Amino acid sequence: MKVECASNIGFCFGVHRAINILEKTASERGGVETLGALVHNQQVLNRLSGMGVRVVKNIDDISGRTVAISSHGVGPAVLAELKSKGLEIVDTTCPFVKRAQVAAKRFHDAGFFTVIYGDVNHPEVKGILGWAGGNGLATLNPQGLDDIPDLSRYIGVLSQTTQIPTGFTSFVKNVIDQALVKDAEIRIADTLCHDIRDRQAAALELAGRVDLMLVIGGHNSANTRHLLDLCKTVSNTHLIETASELQTDWLKGVSRIGITSGASTDETTISEVCSYLDRLSAGA
């Protein structure tokens, strides 16, 4: 049984940067609170907790004088409230998310209605919507635009950073088809994360060459679920968070296994899965 990892695996640039910032802050101050989970990966959060990093869900739950913003970012109203309380803010927002926030603000300042291709319940998308100044919506269904009777003639379109590129392309085409009948002006910003795009391409290429594909990452991680959906189109694929979730009956008749991971999956977790597979292979 041969095991091969995708060429793009482990922490992405944005997560690696956020963790470095948080580890440094926690080390210097003996701990720090984050507004929302830094990343959607429980193993990483457990390790950070051991360093004195505490997750708070609401601003009112902050007990210290320093708070970290997660890699998913926040909207301007949240930033203003944090500043009004005199809190020192440690911003770990991913630069690619920041770019999407800037695009939304640019649309808003130009008088454009912002349409985000993304999950309206995801913290990243909530933050981006905030920068649209309340003049926007998020949806994964382009037909949702039909529900807005007085849709602006001026429409700006962008994407949640972790979405699948082909999905965003299809979404944009559908929005254009709907908007042109309204004599609209449309602006499109490519806000997809380059790392995620490369990771998806590498995973898809590997999935086409193996009998079984394993995606390692948090079950509530958007970019990890997208990898799962993508790999499933070409190979038998399962999502696992740790080696303990791997089921041996998946391996029956399998000679080649491919491994990829979500952008917030750490090297230790990946190594544990690979080691477990090696032990199973040696005992076969």
UniProtKB/Swiss-Prot annotation:
Residues binding isopentenyl diphosphate, per UniProt: H40, H72, H122, S221, N223, S264
Role according to the record: Catalyzes the conversion of 1-hydroxy-2-methyl-2-(E)-butenyl 4-diphosphate (HMBPP) into a mixture of isopentenyl diphosphate (IPP) and dimethylallyl diphosphate (DMAPP). Acts in the terminal step of the DOXP/MEP pathway for isoprenoid precursor biosynthesis.
Organism: Dehalococcoides mccartyi (strain ATCC BAA-2100 / JCM 16839 / KCTC 5957 / BAV1)
Cofactor: [4Fe-4S] cluster
Protein name, entry field: 4-hydroxy-3-methylbut-2-enyl diphosphate reductase
Top-level taxonomic group: Bacteria
Annotated Pfam families: LYTB (PF02401)
Enzyme class (EC, first level): oxidoreductase
GO BP annotations, alphabetical order: dimethylallyl diphosphate biosynthetic process; isopentenyl diphosphate biosynthetic process, methylerythritol 4-phosphate pathway; terpenoid biosynthetic process
Single Gene Ontology MF annotation: metal ion binding
Protein EC: 1.17.7.4
Catalytic activity: isopentenyl diphosphate + 2 oxidized [2Fe-2S]-[ferredoxin] + H2O = (2E)-4-hydroxy-3-methylbut-2-enyl diphosphate + 2 reduced [2Fe-2S]-[ferredoxin] + 2 H(+); dimethylallyl diphosphate + 2 oxidized [2Fe-2S]-[ferredoxin] + H2O = (2E)-4-hydroxy-3-methylbut-2-enyl diphosphate + 2 reduced [2Fe-2S]-[ferredoxin] + 2 H(+)
Residues where dimethylallyl diphosphate binds: H40, H72, H122, S221, N223, S264
Residues engaged in binding [4Fe-4S] cluster: C12, C94, C193
InterPro entries: LytB/IspH
Pathway in which the depicted protein is active: Isoprenoid biosynthesis; dimethylallyl diphosphate biosynthesis; dimethylallyl diphosphate from (2E)-4-hydroxy-3-methylbutenyl diphosphate: step 1/1; Isoprenoid biosynthesis; isopentenyl diphosphate biosynthesis via DXP pathway; isopentenyl diphosphate from 1-deoxy-D-xylulose 5-phosphate: step 6/6
Cofactor note: Binds 1 [4Fe-4S] cluster per subunit.
